[in-house]
A protein has these predicted regions:
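C-terminal-biased regions
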Residues: 3, 25-29, 42-73, 88-205
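Repetitive helical segments and hydrophobic/amphipathic motifs
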Residues: 15-16
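Bacterial N-terminal signal peptides that target proteins for export
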Residues: 1-12
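N-terminal, intrinsically disordered, polar/charged segments of Gram-positive cell-envelope systems
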Residues: 10, 32-45
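C-terminal motif of bacterial Sec signal peptides marking the signal peptidase cleavage site
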Residues: 19-23
Length: 205
């Protein structure tokens, strides 16, 4: 009577070991699959096709009116993510028209998306400009806060040398020379009204 019991016990032990080994294999497979899935998932916050993706957020400027500071922060958040549609919402939220181009463009999101696709880093430029000194300006009876400050001067000769040097982060010597030849700054600039409406992000004359 004892021998059959021993045989059964041995058989049961083998079955238990097989089951245990099989279970371990399944766990390893699941773990490997999970690890593979995790390693292949890119960080959604970083986009290779976004010129501003790896830029740092410019610090808040306490000298700006609160509502202008809020608009600046909203623009920066969207620009750093190349959120063209989000930027377009900010641009069209104001009471007046938004100027994105002097060439008849009427879809800011599509315009910025196309420029980025062509290799023109407009989002990087937008972030860089909003990190530079600004200047309070009055145009058409409206108080505006403009970046860079160079745009707020009457002529290029009035722009202090220090502010000209800061523009080298965005422009090369040839472009800076073109501003001097033209007589004023006509590069990319940003304008926000005292009410916090985003008026323009445009270049040219």
């Amino acid at each position: 009577m004892k021998r059959p019991i021993r045989r059964l016990s041995a058989l049961a032990l083998v079955l238990v070991l097989v089951a245990a080994l099989t279970g371990c294999g399944d766990d390893d497979t699941d773990t490997a699959a999970d690890t593979s899935s995790t390693s292949s998932t890119a960080d959604p916050k970083v986009r290779e096709d976004c010129s501003s993706a790896l830029m740092e957020v410019p610090a808040p400027d306490p000298d700006l009116p609160a509502i202008v500071q809020e608009t600046r922060a909203d623009i920066l958040e969207a620009a750093l993510a190349c959120d063209y549609d989000g930027l377009a919402e900010i641009a069209t939220a104001g009471d007046g028209p938004f100027t994105v181009s002097f060439g008849g463009e009427d879809d800011p999101a599509a315009f910025w998306r196309r420029l980025e696709a062509e290799g023109r880093p407009v989002m990087e430029t937008l972030v860089e400009l909003l990190g530079m000194p600004w200047r309070e300006n009055t145009a058409d009876g409206t108080t505006q806060y403009v970046w860079p400050a160079a745009f707020g001067y009457d002529g290029w000769s009035d722009v202090p040398e220090g502010e000209r040097e800061q523009l080298r982060d965005v422009y090369g010597d040839e472009e800076l020379a073109s501003f001097e030849q033209f007589g004023s700054y006509i590069g990319w600039r940003v304008g926000v009204t005292a009410d916090g409406d985003w008026l323009f992000f445009v270049e040219g004359d």
